């Protein structure tokens, strides 16, 4: 089943996370092109394939992450800003 996600970006800086250690809510070290923050409706470890971008793993949460909104992790703040906000079709795999 295809889901349209609203995907924003974040990084390990204090502006994005309030801390800068890069440790996710699940206790893992966040990795670019791997980690996403998703609502609690998606258990930690859930894999979500984003059309055209690959498969990511739910390892984090976020205060504004609700419904079909997810946050893709980037190594730098500039990369997260450059990503912006995108609507992307995806599915749980």
Where are these regions (language model features)?
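Solvent-exposed, well-ordered loop and adjacent helix/strand elements within mature globular domains
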Residues: 1-93
